[in-house]
Amino acid sequence: MKFTPPPSSLRGPLVIPDKIMMGPGPSNCSKRVLAALNNTCLSNFHDELFQVIDEVKDGLRYIFQTENRTTMCITGSAHTGMEALLCNLLEEGDIVLIANNGIWAERAINMATRYGADVRVLGGPADKPFSMTDFKKAIEQHRPKCLFVVHGDSSSGLLQPLEGLGKICHDYDCLLLVDAVASLCGVPFYMDKWEIDGVYTGSQKVLGAPPGITPISISPKALEVIRSRKTPSKVFYWDLLILGNYWGCYDEQKRYHHTVPSNLIFALREAIAQIAEEGLEPVIRRRQECAEQMYRGLQAMGLEIFVKDPEYRLPTVTCIMIPKGVNWWKVSEYAMNNFSLEIQGGFGPTMGIAWRAGIMGESSTLQRVNFYLYAFKESLKATHPDYVFEKKNGQTNGTK
C-alpha cells in the first residue's frame, strides 16, 4: 500500500490559548462543564445515556418554564432549531409571518422560502421592538399559520417583549415560534404562560455549554400540527416526530435516528444543573446587574449604545456604537493581543457601526464586566491616542 505522507501540521501537540470570550457567543464554559466532556462516549442505547437525557429534559423544561413533553435537543448549532421549527411546521404554500428587524429573522425568511412557504414580512428598525398592535394588525392582514419572532437579537442587542403575543396569535389560529438563542436565562422567559408554541435556544450562549447541540421545545398544539401534515417533514434529520421518539417524548419504543453527541449532552446537563442549583431568578438578576454595570461603564467613557431605550436592551448582548474616526478592528485586535479579550464587531444591521459585548456563561460576573470595561478603554486609548472620553449635554458620545 502506498499513501501520501502525513501532514506536517499534525506533528506537534494541539495548543489552544485561553481567551476571555465576551462577544455574542460562544461563551466561556465552567470547569465543571468542560470536565463533563472528558467522560467516556456512550452508545445511543446505553441506559446511562438515557438517564442523562431524561435529566436534560427535566432541566430544559425548567429553563423554558414549560411542561411540554416534546422537549429535547437537536445535534447541531442553534440554526438547526430554526430549521427544525420551520421545516416541521410549514408545508408548501403555508403562510408564515416573520417579524424582521435583524439578521436572524432574515435567516428565517431564507429558510422558510426554501421550504416553499408563502413568506410575509413585518419589517421594523433594528433598534426598536414591535408593539402588540403591530403584531395584531399584521396577523389580521396576513392570517399566517405561524408567526416567527426573535426574542433577543444578538446582532443588535434588542429585546422584543413577548407577553400577550401568544394570545393574539391563538385568537387567529396562528402558532407562535420564538428564537431565544441569546435571551434564555438572561431575561425572564415563560413558554407556557406566554402561550409559545415553539422555541429553541443555543447551548453556547447564556447557558455556557459548548456549541453543537440545540435545545428545543414545542407545544401540544404544534405537535398536533406536525402530526397532521399532508406530507412528511422535508428534512429527515430535523423530523421532530422521529427525534422526539428517540428522546422519549411520545411513549413509544425508541428507534435509532442518528448517533447523538453523548459528551455534549453531558456538558449541557452540567451547564443546566449549575443554573438549576443557583435558581433562575438569581441567575437572571445577576446578568441584569452585570448589564447595568456595563451600561454605566460605557456611558462614563462617553460611548453610545445602539438600542437607546434601556427597557428594550438585551442584557446578554450590548451593541456599542463605534465613534466617528475610530477603527473598530484595531481596538478589537489590541484587546485580544494584550488582554486575551474578545471584543467582537457588529453583524447584520450593526456591521461596521458597533462592537458587541456579551454577558454570557462564565463571564456573567461584575468582575468580568469591570475587566472588559478596563481593557476596552485601554485598547481604545492605545490605538487612538487622540480620542477624548467625554459626555456632551448629558448624552454619551466620544470625540476625536
UniProtKB/Swiss-Prot annotation:
Residues engaged in binding pyridoxal 5'-phosphate: 77-79, 154, 204, 256, 259
Activity relative to temperature: Optimum temperature is 55 degrees Celsius with 3-hydroxykynurenine and pyruvate at pH 7. Optimum temperature is 60 degrees Celsius with L-alanine and glyoxylate at pH 7.
Its EC number(s): 2.6.1.63, 2.6.1.44
Pathway: Amino-acid degradation; L-kynurenine degradation; kynurenate from L-kynurenine: step 1/2
GO function terms (MF aspect): alanine-glyoxylate transaminase activity; kynurenine-glyoxylate transaminase activity; L-serine-pyruvate transaminase activity
Region spans: Binds to and confers specificity for 3-hydroxykynurenine: 43-44
GO biological process: glycine biosynthetic process, by transamination of glyoxylate; glyoxylate catabolic process; L-kynurenine catabolic process
Top-rank EC class of the record's enzyme: transferase
Primary subcellular site in the record, as a coarse category: other
Record flagged with keyword Transferase: yes
Binding residue positions for substrate: 154, 356
Record localization: Peroxisome
GO cellular component terms, semicolon-separated: peroxisome
Keywords: Aminotransferase, Peroxisome, Pyridoxal phosphate, Transferase
Cofactors: pyridoxal 5'-phosphate
Catalysed transformations (reactions): glyoxylate + L-alanine = glycine + pyruvate; L-kynurenine + glyoxylate = kynurenate + glycine + H2O; 3-hydroxy-L-kynurenine + glyoxylate = xanthurenate + glycine + H2O; 3-hydroxy-L-kynurenine + pyruvate = xanthurenate + L-alanine + H2O
Activity profile over pH: Optimum pH is 9 with 3-hydroxykynurenine and pyruvate, or L-alanine and glyoxylate as substrates (at 50 degrees Celsius).
N6-(pyridoxal phosphate)lysine carried by residues: 205
Alphabetical list of InterPro entries matching this protein: Aminotrans_V_dom, PyrdxlP-dep_Trfase, PyrdxlP-dep_Trfase_major, PyrdxlP-dep_Trfase_small, SP_NH2Trfase/AEP_transaminase
Source organism, top-level taxon: Eukaryota
PANTHER family to which the protein is assigned, alphabetical: ALANINE--GLYOXYLATE AMINOTRANSFERASE, AMINOTRANSFERASE CLASS V
Protein family: Belongs to the class-V pyridoxal-phosphate-dependent aminotransferase family.
Function summary: Catalyzes the pyridoxal 5'-phosphate-dependent transamination of both 3-hydroxykynurenine and L-kynurenine to xanthurenic acid and kynurenic acid, respectively, preferentially using the alpha-ketoacid pyruvate, glyoxylate or oxaloacetate as the amino group acceptor. The affinity and catalytic efficiency for 3-hydroxykynurenine is higher than for L-kynurenine. Involved in the detoxification of cytotoxic metabolite 3-hydroxykynurenine generated by the hydroxylation of L-kynurenine, an intermediate in the tryptophan catabolism pathway.
Record text on subunit structure and interactions: Homodimer. May form homotetramer.
The protein's name: 3-hydroxykynurenine transaminase
Taxonomic lineage: Eukaryota, Metazoa, Ecdysozoa, Arthropoda, Hexapoda
